[in-house]
Amino acid sequence: MRKIFLSLCLAFCVVLSGCADEGNSKSTVQLLFPNPDSGIWKYIGQLCAQLMREANYEVELHHCTNAAEQVEQLKAAVEKNPAAIVIGAQDANALGEPLTLAKEKNIPVIAYDRLIMHTDAISYYASFENNSVGEFQARYVEEKLGLKNGAGPFTIEFIAGSPDDTNAPLFFNGAFNYLKPYIDKGQLVVPSGQKDFQSVATDGWKPDNAQRRMTEILQKYYADGKSLNVVVAANDDLAEALIRAQESVGYKGTPTILTGQDAGANGIANIKAGKQSMTIYKDPEILCGKIVRMVKAVVEGSQPAINDVTNIRNDVKTIPSYLCIPIIVDSTNVDIVKDFR
């Protein structure tokens, strides 16, 4: 598998170098991304900027610590009248006003990974199959527990992402809807009773919020050695919150099947240590490469390659999109993940 992966990476780099050699005129692209303290977002920003420069674009890279700061960054970016703007939204519901200004100036806007809501100013969207993320987590649980063979009952809890991230409900719904038949049959049991997105969401994706909630659940429903068999955590940070919560209460049940996402440094370390079962790898090189090719197309006045023209809607319009396929990573293939610490 590793040889195949490396071969694909080499082929991908050749494609990108070919794009760079085609010689775009020097045009400025504004890149706006969340949280500079996040290892993955810091890496994504640096990678996208590098690939844009290799494709002969000038780049201005911005990270924000909150939604208000990103709004101001976007307003400033629009004033500079760039060739294109790429946005990984801090808050997908907060960018409507400055995006209206971008549309008035005919500036192409591409949403990176997080769909920006309530605006008709988004030109294109590039992400991964986010419903598939949750479904892949659920399929992993199904296989490990032998649910197809009627095994159970097993206890399960959910830790979802932030309500202001449009991907978070997709992750949760993908997992929950796949596992719901097993919940209905009694093969999976949710002792806390928390089975809807709002009940299991984690404000700001903050691990401390998830840890507090899971500590309460463990103390109330899993005391005296009762086992928590499965936790579907939306990403690696939230998975680590469960690990810390179990350590803080002295959890004595059987090991928990624990999902994650992002293949971050903490997730990979926890998989190697046997504390986390799996993660979902959304390879930043694949998505950043797609973004570069989208920018190149719109700047040159052509149509970017897209693979979904019907399913991605932000409450105002259907957004032409390209959706990549994520990869399940566990202890058997953990070495395919690039180190972006």
Regions found by a protein language model. Give the residues of each.
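Bacterial N-terminal signal peptides
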Residues: 7-15
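A residue-level marker of the well-folded mature domains of exported/periplasmic proteins
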Residues: 19-341
